């Protein structure tokens, strides 16, 4: 079995760790920590942040993390035409493909904004979240930890951002 193959025991309590907007400057450190603890995450990447960080995207796949699409440059997709939405997703998938050898398997729309045009244009399962750490706002690692630990339940999907250094801390 390769490192990228992941066995999940669904009978055990678990949460999904998800990171938006990257890859960021410290995504490599985050991947090393996940690997150290045999943990995995889903990375919802902005296409514009992939150039120059292709090694991080490749490492995500190699360590069994899930590759997610978060648009090219984080627009409010509900305000775009179907063609522009498809371009946002397609361009990002192309960049992920070039870096990792496979495209995203899931998509998270920026701001969680979904309408019928987005639904019909994305072509991937859309994943939202149940706990928002607000790390983008607080920029405080302990605040994010407290938010999660105060509310976390089995099956939660936790939203963080790998572009903020405090989220990696």
Q: What do these predicted regions represent?
A:
Residues 1-80, 84-91, 95, 102:
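Active-site beta->alpha N-cap acidic-glycine motif
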Residues 29, 51, 75-169:
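Catalytic domains of cell-wall/extracellular-matrix polysaccharide-remodeling enzymes
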């Amino acid at each position: 079995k390769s490192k990228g193959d992941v066995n999940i025991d669904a009978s055990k309590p678990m949460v999904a760790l998800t990171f938006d907007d990257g890859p960021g400057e410290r995504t490599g450190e985050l991947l090393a920590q996940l690997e150290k603890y045999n943990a995995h995450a889903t990375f919802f990447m902005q296409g514009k942040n992939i150039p120059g960080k292709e090694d991080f995207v490749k490492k995500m796949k190699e360590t069994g993390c899930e590759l997610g699409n978060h648009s090219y440059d984080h627009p409010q997709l509900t305000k775009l035409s179907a063609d522009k939405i498809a371009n946002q997703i397609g361009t990002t998938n192309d960049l992920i493909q070039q870096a990792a050898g496979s495209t995203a398997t899931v998509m998270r729309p920026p701001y969680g904004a979904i309408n019928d045009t987005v639904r019909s244009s994305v072509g991937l399962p859309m994943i939202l979240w149940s706990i928002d750490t607000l790390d983008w706002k607080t920029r405080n690692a302990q605040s994010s930890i407290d938010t999660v630990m105060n509310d976390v339940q089995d099956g939660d999907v936790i939203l963080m951002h790998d572009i903020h250094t405090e989220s990696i801390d």
